[in-house]
Amino acid sequence: MVFEGHLVGTGLKVGVVVGRFNEFITSKLLGGALDGLKRHGVEENDIDVAWVPGAFEIPLIAKKMANSGKYDAVITLGTVIRGATTHYDYVCNEVAKGVASLSLQTDIPVIFGVLTTETIEQAIERAGTKAGNKGYESAVAAIEMAHLSKHWA
């Protein structure tokens, strides 16, 4: 038997956690995510958005959302751009590990929509220009995973 999540978001409740750092990019990711959710049938009043200071703070609030019992899926959005120090490596690794572990801890799909790029140009491309919008893609993944997860609930 083959299982696939369908892409109709009607009736789903979705939490979104967005890092404010690099807000000119993360706001575009959020716009893409909201567009993706609404285009697939998620009602605006079934979407909650929490802004956090930066990417490093995303896992805690995503965990609290997932544990609240209110959401069928949680989307995480942020942007980390490499600088001149090793700070980038620490932030990227910890955020990725933190978000990745949440689905397993909470049994709620937690989608990783955090950009980790070498340059600001790469981030801009992934926030709605040449490379699509990773926020939109994260929204579609959240809908699909929410339905797949419910199959075994």
From Swiss-Prot:
GO terms for molecular function: 6,7-dimethyl-8-ribityllumazine synthase activity. It catalyses: (2S)-2-hydroxy-3-oxobutyl phosphate + 5-amino-6-(D-ribitylamino)uracil = 6,7-dimethyl-8-(1-D-ribityl)lumazine + phosphate + 2 H2O + H(+). Keywords: Riboflavin biosynthesis, Transferase. Pathway: Cofactor biosynthesis; riboflavin biosynthesis; riboflavin from 2-hydroxy-3-oxobutyl phosphate and 5-amino-6-(D-ribitylamino)uracil: step 1/2. One of its GO terms (cellular component) is cytosol. Activity is competitively inhibited by the bisubstrate-type compounds TS23, JC33 and JC72, with Ki values in the low nanomolar range. Disulfide bonds: none annotated. One of its GO terms (biological process) is riboflavin biosynthetic process. It comes from the Bacteria. CDD domains: Lumazine_synthase-I. Belongs to the DMRL synthase family. HAMAP family: Lumazine_synth. Catalyzes the formation of 6,7-dimethyl-8-ribityllumazine by condensation of 5-amino-6-(D-ribitylamino)uracil with 3,4-dihydroxy-2-butanone 4-phosphate. This is the penultimate step in the biosynthesis of riboflavin. Forms an icosahedral capsid composed of 60 subunits, arranged as a dodecamer of pentamers. This is 6,7-dimethyl-8-ribityllumazine synthase. It comes from Bacillus anthracis. The gene is ribH.
